[in-house]
Amino acid sequence: MQHVFIIGSRGLPAKYGGFETFVEELVTHKQSADVYYHVACLSDKEHHTHFQYAGADCFTIKAPKLGPARVIAYDMMAINYSLQMVKKEQIAHPIFYVL
């Protein structure tokens, strides 16, 4: 199983366009059962909760409201949490796709 972590979009389902639509199209048109997507989702309320969307593991990150710097904090927090998941679940050779 190839685990792919997608970081940098606001999450799923797509509500904004651009990166979000790309991620939704990628996840919903997956061609191989051997690929498993983990998608970071920006949240104002929840932190480190998981839900399934179109077969992908979506996890929430509640980044602090820092104005334009919020997206940088969000990316860093999502990468850190993803690395924790990789270590905890002993995922070999994960792929990180940072948008």
Model-derived segments and their meaning:
Residues 1-4:
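Extreme N-terminal starter segment of soluble prokaryotic enzymes
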Residues 15-26:
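Conserved alpha-helical elements of sugar-nucleotide-dependent glycosyltransferases
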Residues 19, 71, 75:
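Conserved donor sugar-nucleotide recognition element shared by glycan-biosynthetic enzymes
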Residues 59-62, 67, 79-99:
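Short N-terminal targeting/anchoring amphipathic segment
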Residues 7-15, 29-69:
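N-terminal strand-loop element at the rim of the active site
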Residues 24, 28, 32, 80, ...:
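Short, well-ordered alpha-helices that flank and scaffold nucleotide-derived cofactor binding pockets
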